[in-house]
Amino acid sequence: MIIWVKEVADRVTVKKVRAFVNNDAIIEPFVDMEAVGPEDCIIVSKTDNAIPSSFFVNAVIVYEDVFEAVTKNILEEVAYNYDYYYLKNALSASQNENIDTIITGSSYGIFGIDCKQLPSAVNLSLISQDMFYSIKGIYKACTLNKNIRNIVLCCSYYFFYSDLSKTQNPGELQRISKVYHPLYGDMHNCKLLPPKRNILFSSNIFDIDGIVDLYAKGKYEKSYFGNEYSRRDYATRIWEDKSKDWSELNEIEREQAGIRRAALHNKNNRWKAAFNENKQLFHELSCFCMSRDIELLVVVVPATKYYRTALCKEFREDFFEVLNEADGIVGLLDLFEEPSFSDGDFNDMDHLSESGAEKLTSAIAELLQLPVYSRP
């Protein structure tokens, strides 16, 4: 099949079309109908008033209509699979030889770190990411980049009880379908993984996958949050009036929200099998880092007093058991009760706001002696 392009200056050209079609496609400028075969197609512009009726014996594609449809499809795809494209591009960025620090963990790493301020770091954290998939990202990044010298694991005390693959929440399980299984090919302990919803068009002409990858890469700016997605949008609003921000809640509302949030996490302490598996995984990670002369730093992120006082005390004891029994060398920055973080530094009960992220990022950079972008 040959793709014939009826060129219109500054609108539709062979060069423009070539950027969007499959690499093996044959593209030629249209000259006359005699060269057009029965399986060929012709791309035209809706602004071209000189399209003979004989064109429509063949497959005719109106460039503007296809461009609009594909653009809409790609925007929908990236919005639906935002986490997948974020992590895919973060892993790609980790291959850069200037990157020597990998930051990872759950949502605490996403909310708590501003990697735009750390030119030598990449953040592989994601919302609801557990120990297993955090380590998957670490190993992949270190395989792709031998210059990695620091691993920063952002978490809370209950982290070693987490296992995303055993969740009873279908929406959370979809994270494996949409993100981790496509990237790592691993379902972990999940026995029945729900299918990933397919949004992208299929085409034997247009390189849809290449276009969406190019678009998503252009949106990646080292940070999960930006103009379209803010920390405020992702606040865990388990208080009564969802229209309120954390900063607008009164003392009673904050206390109630903190208790509810901690109660959700306290349920995790029944997952002893997950704890034992994560304990072994962390031990292996510490040995891996030590064998490669990589500094492993565990950061317990700050939390509000409303959440801290309600969190199960057993988590802290078990957390330190894991760290103390690891054979490798493990650094610890425990800021769980750090008083320099005020209520204004939080987005909700246990996630940092922009000001809180700036403080935590600076603390980690200072400890690891990482270069920091100076603000204008």
Regions found by a protein language model. Give the residues of each.
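Short, charged N-terminal beta->alpha structural module
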Residues: 1-29, 71-79, 109-117, 122
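A short, well-structured beta->alpha microelement
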Residues: 18-37, 86-87, 132-133
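Phosphate-bearing ligand-interacting subdomains
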Residues: 30-72
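Membrane/wall-proximal cationic-aromatic binding patches
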Residues: 65-119, 123, 133-140
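Membrane-embedded segments
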Residues: 103-104, 108-187
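Secreted/periplasmic serine-hydrolase-like ester/acetyl group-modifying domain
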Residues: 170-284
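Active-site segments of SGNH/GDSL-like serine hydrolases
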Residues: 285-311
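C-terminal regions of proteins
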Residues: 310-376
